[in-house]
């Protein structure tokens, strides 16, 4: 069974060693989906959505929201951001009956990166 929760945050960045619009400072409203794979425990839940929300907000959203991403992720491409997010969540979101399965990060409504467990 898969359990997912979506989040939004705003941040600014620029892409280094890139020739185009994205080399200049600009911002995005990012959308993040975090998915766990697991088996419901005795309480019927893979993981309480409240716990999932708390972990993602604390480890990712509160760190990145309204930040200059290059201070946190030097080459802040969406691909590198997804990998950074995975590293922040991998340990806290792996329990006895569930594991971090997928991170999807949208930079725009039509452009996104998907990172899955098998790619780690």
Residue ranges and their predicted role:
Residues 1-120:
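Charge-rich, low-complexity N-terminal segments
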């Amino acid at each position: 069974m898969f359990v997912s929760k979506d989040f939004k945050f705003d941040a600014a960045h620029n892409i280094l060693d890139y020739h185009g619009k994205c080399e200049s400072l600009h911002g995005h409203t990012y959308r993040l989906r975090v998915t766990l794979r697991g088996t419901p425990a005795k309480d019927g839940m893979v993981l309480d959505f409240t716990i999932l929300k708390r972990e993602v907000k604390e480890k990712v959203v509160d760190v990145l929201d309204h930040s200059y991403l290059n201070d946190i992720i030097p080459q802040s491409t969406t691909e590198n951001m997804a990998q950074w997010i995975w590293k922040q969540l991998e340990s806290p979101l792996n329990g006895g009956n569930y594991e971090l399965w997928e991170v999807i990060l949208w930079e725009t409504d039509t452009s996104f990166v998907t990172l899955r467990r098998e790619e780690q």
